[in-house]
Amino acid sequence: GSGDVMDLEKFEHAITKYGTPLYVFDIDEVKRKTDYFRDRFRESAGLCFAIKANPFLTCTMSKVTDRIEVCSMGEFEICRELQIEAEKLLISGVLKKKEDITEILNIYGGRCRYTVESVEQLYSYINWSSTHGEKINVYLRLTSGNQFGMDEEAIEKIIASRDQFPMIKVCGIHFFSGTQKKTAEKFSKEIAYLDKFCWKIEQKYGFTMSELEYGPGIAVPYFKDQEDTLEADIEVIKTAISGMKWKGKVMLEMGRAFVASCGYYLTCVHECKKNNDRNYCIVDGGMHQIQYDGQIRGMYQPKCRMYPDGREGKKEKWTICGALCTANDVLVRDIELTAPGEGSVIIFENAGAYAMTEGMSLFLSHELPAVVFYSEKEGFKLARNKQETYKWNMEDHK
């Protein structure tokens, strides 16, 4: 389940060519991980990638998954510019603005799939489809008890009155209850609940949901000594799916489970010093560029390595601090390193999901690091150059 880690030597080339701080995404690992899920689920479930986890991997993932989930207008523009086939897109109803939905409908019409978050939203689709005479495929989002989606009653009403809007094809239910789930029994409970609901609709309205778009929120171990429960979680999900009375198609929608393991964040040591018997490494990156979601800073130890690694000296505990002028800018506390020095590069692992987008990347107007892809076949490839951000933090002046 857990991926193969890139060799230290491979990073040498990237460091020399692109400098630091730097994000590296191992495309081979992304494909390995996706193959791994394919292999485990086979016929029992399809795979959908939520691109919010790592929009840089949109193109790669669109080739290896069945579907791409788009949650914002920006994400839609990414897919459009990359010319991802409309048929692969699931447009999430979290896009609340009517004009956004209308814009997407005007571009792709019935070729995409859409999730519906509210009855009001359904009416935007009904109006568009009757005006344009084009059929639209929708998934009704069932709430998990928060502000998203609709309750069972609202969904039942829609199903009951489906003959009134023949241009809307209800494909199924969309359900997502939260992420980094801790217990396997949560998956089986949810799947049993969804099974019961889909079955009820079949019995009560003579209507079969053909699909269930389900976001399990599988937990990913980011840190040292964190248990990897992936194998066990997959078994539980598979067993629960095979036990369903409802026999439609299940599509698993995931983000970090696919991509967390492919990412690395590289930052270079500028200075090493001792303050009151504590060893500090000051690096050129910082907490604004690396964020493990769910991390309480300093509480967990991310998996890190140092390049070059064969230095002489004794292993000591070091605290790695970034370049931001805040005492909170601690990347790792008490990590054991052997003689780090100026020019040593600290490589953070498991930085493939959310790590680059959840930090405060505009803070202090630092530039955004470059992003590179790595694959055995093509070596390193620049995906995005370093970007200045100061322009976004100042008034436009003539």
Regions found by a protein language model. Give the residues of each.
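Active-site-proximal beta-alpha core segment in soluble small-molecule metabolic enzymes
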Residues: 42-211, 218, 236, 240
